[in-house]
Amino acid sequence: MSNKYKDTLLIGKTDFDMRANLNQKEPKFEQFWQENQIYNKKLKLNENKKVFVLHDGPPYANGDLHIGHALNKTLKDFIIRFKNTTGYYAPFIMGWDTHGLPIESAVTKMGVDRKSMSSVAFRELCYKYALEQVSNQANQFNRLGMFTDYDTKYVTLTHDFEMSELRLFEKMYQKGLIYKDLKPIYWSPSSESALADSEIIYKDISSPSIYVGCDVINSDEFKNTQLIIWTTTPWTLPSNQLIAIGSKIKYSLIQVENSDKQFILASDLINQVSQNIGWENVKVIKEIDANKLVGLNYVHPLYDTKISKVVLGHHVTSESGSGLVHIASGFGEDDFLIAKQNNIKPFAPIDNQGKFTTQISDLDPQLVGMFYDDTNKIITKRLEENKKLLKLKFLTHSYPHDWRTKKPVIYRCTLQWFVNLAPVKNDILKNVDQINTHPKWAKKRLYQVLDERTDWTISRQRLWGVPIIAFYDQNDDLVLNEQILNYAINKIEEVGTNAWFSLDADEFLPEQYKNKSLKKEKDILDVWFDSGSSAIALSQKYPNLKLPYDMYLEGNDQYRGWFNASMINSTIYSNTSPYKQLVSHGMTTDEKGNKMSKSLGNGVDPIAFANDLGADILRLWVASTDFTDDQKIGKEIIKQISESYRKIRNTIRFILANLNDFNVKTDYQTKLSEVDMYSLFNLTSFKNKVIQAYQELNFSLVYTLVMNYVTKNLSAFYLDFIKDILYINSKNDLRRRQVQTVLYEQLYCLIDVLRPILVHTIEEVYQNLNDNNKVESVHLLDNKEQNFVYDKEFINKWDQVMILRDDVNKALEISRENKIINKGFEAVVNIKLDKEYDDLKNIKDLSQIFIVNSINFVDNIDNSFIKTNISSIKVEQKQGLKCQRCWQIFDNLIDDEICNHCNNVVKSLLETKCE
């Protein structure tokens, strides 16, 4: 282009930079939102609208956020922002889980000696540390662009929350659901505490697998015979009390070549056991009915002085092992029940740290003080020396681990507090039946987990948590009733939970129970009891937020965790589900599908990511994934997302630049050309689909729809052909103002559909928009009503135009390849329409819309025409002179420089300057 005419073109200008520099701009917007209370102002605007509550599951307040936190909160933020712009009052009250072992451990690692200080002093350090962690995580969530007020949050360590929890405990007690009993439960030596089922994860480990022979005694029928048992926990053998058999299982007495012993095992397992041990030439002497084995005495495989017997066991099968099961009542749930049925007291000589206690000293003093797992070698060696070890090998199998420490747990019989779920199980399952879930299979999964759940172990042997309110006399017998419990909780309401750990028991007892030397319970409530009470606590603090809440949204690891505990607590408290809809998302993995771990070095730090590429890129990644499945993230994926972001940003930048001189009050046009109307129809269709996708939580579809619309409907079509109108026509030209009107609507459409996702970028867009009607922040707006609807005949016609456009583009591409033309504006396009599309001849400005020099509709064609979808096309090169201003080719130019249209525009510019 000649420099002579460059300044006469209306090239749009905007301060909305091509380079995003998100890491520099985003913190400024976050500060702006917080300082100006944008979230609270939006809630105020929405206060009379329908309430929508997405109840935030509390992350644990320990350490920095990981990518899973970012995924979870960003998904919630999408929903909260969308609801607040589409007719709802949707508060986002974020929560934190702040009690329990990890915080105790973190404080201890800071050099604090828990045993050298009072319980209250240690608890105060935990309290201080937890609040510091909450503050740190809140700042990090703020960096990711969450729409919330960080001063309006719930934290499980606050007095009001703890009291809500204790009142729930009281209600459970009043309903007869709370009890204390000696039971085998999951015990974590690494945490030194009981664990609930929800706190268990499974990992593969290698364990010793041993077959052991136990000598039968006092039997004429089974002389010189051993009962075969099998176990992967040799350390439990010192505690063996019984051998259990199945009542419906057939057993056999066998003779093995080169052995002076006979053996008894399940008939169905002879081949498997023989193969595992390495026996050959096994002879079945006779089959034995199970009842004949009941009461049979045997010598303990480790201690000759200990005699035990064979009993029936409900859990014994002939699918694996030997069909005879070693029973140690202190280390297994079924073992405990069988021992109880046979009037045998539980025996569990293992302490809180997993070490053998002096309870074993009479039988085996060598084991006292040893860690249970370290005794396996000693025990198997003794069995071998005593000729009781038939086979030792190692097998890899799935084994329960502590979900926090990632170390193995054991079943251990201890006195614990429980919630009896049997009386409320049907109510719980009925409530599950009434909820909606996303994905659909989630309801069945939650139902199954709750249906199979046994009584809830709610006590923990820790210090940092909500105390269990109970008392004991000098004989350690429990002293508790409704009067005592209510009095104690009322006292704690006055003085706080720390007082439970510092004041005498009498301070919490009614008058008639004082001065009786009663002792307080030392255990605290399970942290799942804490977080599972959150919906109740929130409903009490904010009466306008009524149960059940509209939605819970957490990772798919919460079916056994928060989803589960919340449903139990809410059902017991108010016989209602805490949520109407339950939504779960998958876990984050690297690009190869591997779980993220420090050892693999494949983790993604969301804050480092935001401070490098920008939080909006991370948020766009979240939107792009199918969150119901596991989400992959890595360099290549982020590269693709960044490219998508650039396309969106550049499209918006073009629109902003070309609205720079547009005043919506004076320049907005209601009468538009047909192509403008068609563009607005596509806008409405697109926006409706996006809104539906948001409503269905299909954010990946939102992402796909946006990218298709930006690239195909806007960049490759409408924005492409209107450039000449915007740049070349005069400023106040009607056609130019019509196009700008469409751009104005397109921009607001993009603002609405992208506002929940690209929260910083859309704020930047809005701040750079030339609009006299602007409010303080884009996040105070509701979605703009954009209902551009036209009759079907009109839409069908323009759908056909778009097909013809594709035909022309195909012909142009072939012509470029054949060197007929270089650019589209050189092309003279001759078109023979198929008969049913003849009406397209009447469309105005097709050459401008198709960005070609001219279009001729013809009736006759020859072999040089190319057959396309609805037409036959021939492209020729326009011969003539190129206008130095608009670059279009004409037969004649004024002064051999510019076309007539450009000349008129330039003249009007000169006249305006002179005025």
UniProtKB/Swiss-Prot annotation:
It is found in: Cytoplasm. This is Isoleucine--tRNA ligase. Signal peptide: none annotated. L-isoleucyl-5'-AMP binds at residue 554. Monomer. It comes from Mycoplasma mycoides subsp. mycoides SC (strain CCUG 32753 / NCTC 10114 / PG1). One of its GO terms (cellular component) is cytosol. Its EC number is 6.1.1.5. One of its GO terms (molecular function) is aminoacyl-tRNA deacylase activity. GO terms for biological process: isoleucyl-tRNA aminoacylation. The gene is ileS. Binds 1 zinc ion per subunit.
